[in-house]
């Protein structure tokens, strides 16, 4: 009988203040996070961004206790899912693979091989597919498979997205309903979906399905919510967490909050739709930054729907996804990691600067130019990095 491993994919997060810089470097080293036409620029740019953003990010993590709870919650989700699966007769072991911090994907793969797993179900903890989230994790897993004959022998099936799964939609609707009914005037409360943004070019140029899935998911949740409540709430959708000068999906969360407040909305129920675990973007960005913006613009009652974490119906839904995959649904890792033809990315592989003496020289020159430009801006107090908000 096949020994089943369920591999949960997630982003990862720094657990201590001193981890913030290395975490940011790992994040921005990923070509799916920042798409550059020249491979040699990726590492210097990641180093520069992590250097510039570390101080501000460290303050954000201090405001929520000094580190991200994402690993703890994800591992708790893994335990709950494993217990549920075994209770329904599926003898599976769950493993956690973080993309940018511990436990890394390599560690999870090593654990599965050591445990004698022969069949793997890959389940991203991102309901909505994007080339920068699930796509990046699938590609990293494919890279490991291509370089490991033992891992390549395993049967691997993947779940690409699950934004429309009934248990997920119902879980979200139930949690939103609780917050609406806790408002002073439930029927007048405004439901505000906020999703993690991606650059607009990902959708319009690269064919990323993320925006369509977010919009469709919001409508599914609203429809179920209305059926449950018996009345209709106004609602809107926006995108948060943009980085850098590039245009991201609009409207932006902070701008919509200002408009809602000025339009007379007093009771707001904020729904972090693309997050299934509490982490920096719910606990700090929404609960602190966006709450302050809302209150400054006249919103009196600001309620935030909690992340799903280990909500029982949500765990049941994850188990159903695993069960369906074991029964023939799901797709191959090759298909899951495949990008639209319009996406131009260099291979996602571990690499050292330089492949020969000439390239070493050019890599050094690029790094020196970046470093000197950074120092010059610090000295004169102005320049492109100041203009785009990195300094």
Swiss-Prot record:
SUPFAM superfamilies membership: Chelatase (SSF53800), Chlorophyll a-b binding protein (SSF103511)
Group of enzyme by EC: lyase
GO BP, sorted A to Z: heme biosynthetic process
Gene Ontology CC, one term: cytoplasm
E.C. numbers: 4.98.1.1
Keywords from the UniProt entry: Cytoplasm, Heme biosynthesis, Iron, Lyase, Metal-binding, Porphyrin biosynthesis
Gene3D superfamilies xref list: 3.40.50.1400
Binding site for Fe cation: 196, 281
InterPro entries documented for this protein: Ferrochelatase, Ferrochelatase_AS, Ferrochelatase_C, Ferrochelatase_N
GO molecular function: ferrochelatase activity; metal ion binding
A Pfam family hit: Ferrochelatase
Keyword Cytoplasm set for record: yes
Subcellular localization, as worded in the UniProt entry: Cytoplasm
Protein name: Ferrochelatase
Gene source species: Prochlorococcus marinus (strain NATL2A)
